[in-house]
Structure formats: C-alpha cells, structure tokens
Amino acid sequence: MDKTKRPLRKSKRSFRRRLPPPIGSGDRIDYRNMSLISRFISEQGKILSRRVNRLTLKQQRLITIAIKQARILSSLPFLNNEKQFERPESIPKTAGPSIRNK
C-alpha cells in the first residue's frame, strides 16, 4: 500500500486532565483528623485503594495507619453497615410471656 493511500489513525490514548492532589500540603495525616480520614473510607467502612484515592505510596501508608489507629481508639467504626442492625418489619412480634425450660 502506498503511503498516500493509508488511512489516518487517531491516537488511542485519551488525555486526562490532572486533578489537584486530595491531600494538601498543610493537611496533617493524623488519627484525630476525622474530616481528612473519612474521605478515604468507603460507605461500608473499607479503606479505599491508592488508585481510587490518587495518593502516593507514602501518603497511602500514613492514611492506613491513621485509620487503623482511629478504629482501635473507637473514633471510627470497623464496620459501617446499618442494614445489618435494622429489624425487618415483616416479622411480627410475639405477644405474651416467654416460657423457659430449666
């Protein structure tokens, strides 16, 4: 095929605009900074990955340590699953005294 008859190929790579870093230079990664830590936790209470967070390896390690410290000190729950504790409304409650066998 001649060079003149070749079809033009578009590049397959798309350009993505660079987003600002999620952690500013003034932000301290600490277990007491709940507003910062809560941005890196999913709705279920799981720690989000580096790809999702757009953090460096060092920042991700510090965030993980801070989240684990906050969980141990009960500042942050281990699980965030409200559906587990909700009682279904379709089950009727039994009326009357309960009988125990001794």
UniProtKB/Swiss-Prot annotation:
<comment type="subunit">
    <text>Part of the 30S ribosomal subunit.</text>
</comment>
<comment type="similarity">
    <text>Belongs to the bacterial ribosomal protein bS18 family.</text>
</comment>
<dbReference type="InterPro" id="IPR018275">
    <property type="entry name" value="Ribosomal_bS18_CS"/>
</dbReference>
<dbReference type="GO" id="GO:0070181">
    <property type="term" value="F:small ribosomal subunit rRNA binding"/>
</dbReference>
<keyword id="KW-0689">Ribosomal protein</keyword>
<dbReference type="GO" id="GO:0009507">
    <property type="term" value="C:chloroplast"/>
</dbReference>
<protein>
    <recommendedName>
        <fullName>Small ribosomal subunit protein bS18c</fullName>
    </recommendedName>
</protein>
<keyword id="KW-0687">Ribonucleoprotein</keyword>
<dbReference type="Pfam" id="PF01084">
    <property type="entry name" value="Ribosomal_S18"/>
</dbReference>
<keyword id="KW-0934">Plastid</keyword>
<feature type="region of interest" description="Disordered">
    <location>
        <begin position="1"/>
        <end position="26"/>
    </location>
</feature>
<dbReference type="InterPro" id="IPR036870">
    <property type="entry name" value="Ribosomal_bS18_sf"/>
</dbReference>
<keyword id="KW-0694">RNA-binding</keyword>
<keyword id="KW-0150">Chloroplast</keyword>
<keyword id="KW-0699">rRNA-binding</keyword>
<dbReference type="GO" id="GO:0005763">
    <property type="term" value="C:mitochondrial small ribosomal subunit"/>
</dbReference>
<feature type="compositionally biased region" description="Basic residues">
    <location>
        <begin position="1"/>
        <end position="19"/>
    </location>
</feature>
<dbReference type="InterPro" id="IPR001648">
    <property type="entry name" value="Ribosomal_bS18"/>
</dbReference>
<dbReference type="GO" id="GO:0003735">
    <property type="term" value="F:structural constituent of ribosome"/>
</dbReference>
<dbReference type="GO" id="GO:0006412">
    <property type="term" value="P:translation"/>
</dbReference>
